[in-house]
């Protein structure tokens, strides 16, 4: 099915009691790993770039072109959305212009009325080009590209107002955070999520900070209305651990590898790529989106 807007497959997840994964990429290798995992599991997927990752990769146009061409060259058949994660207003508009098929405008750091007004503007522009829109109310804990949130519970009335702007799916704070969860984390506020989904019945909710949340809590959140779960830190840890292990083994057994040119980055990065693919496949299974393409 190739490159598509995320609206239909996220809504299908909401209606059928599973969630799709929004997996952040940081380079060519991660993008390949995510695509391989999605194809192997026959799962729809959003490949996401944060503002920082896009800058690192050479800009939004480079990211859009990379993902689009890999989908074609790798023969990917599952639905893939190219999604901006936590974008400022100008970044959201740029991504719409260069060919992203889904964007998140994050105005959660703005006064509520300004957030709503700017979101409505983004929705009008995006929908005119068939681009799906995610927005946020409350703030997600942790730090994302310099935006620091304390992990608020999204106000119900603000969530209802945000849905009325015409967005396609809503990120709302329910005690979740970006990055590793501390030992004293109290868990998702599932009672608040239940109130939230009752206020916007049938509307897809997005769970940010999906890495490190116990599987039973994720599954209960999906049962209550979460239809998209974002994952980044988990993939980063998997990649880092596998790459470090490869380096340790190489240094300890250098003679064994003599002549194999393992200094070649294509070989050096391979274990990390495989680890990311494995992590993504495992999350797809937990989210219930395998064989939903």
Curated annotation (Swiss-Prot):
Key words, A-Z: Glycolysis, Lyase, Metal-binding, Zinc
InterPro entries documented for this protein: Aldolase_TIM, Class_II_FBP_aldolase, FBA_II, Fruc_bis_ald_class-2
Gene Ontology biological process terms from the UniProt entry: fructose 1,6-bisphosphate metabolic process; glycolytic process
Cofactor: Zn(2+)
Binding site for Zn(2+) 2: 106, 136
Residues the record lists as binding dihydroxyacetone phosphate: 179, 209-211, 230-233
Function: Catalyzes the aldol condensation of dihydroxyacetone phosphate (DHAP or glycerone-phosphate) with glyceraldehyde 3-phosphate (G3P) to form fructose 1,6-bisphosphate (FBP) in gluconeogenesis and the reverse reaction in glycolysis.
Protein name as annotated: Fructose-bisphosphate aldolase
Native species: Streptococcus pyogenes serotype M6 (strain ATCC BAA-946 / MGAS10394)
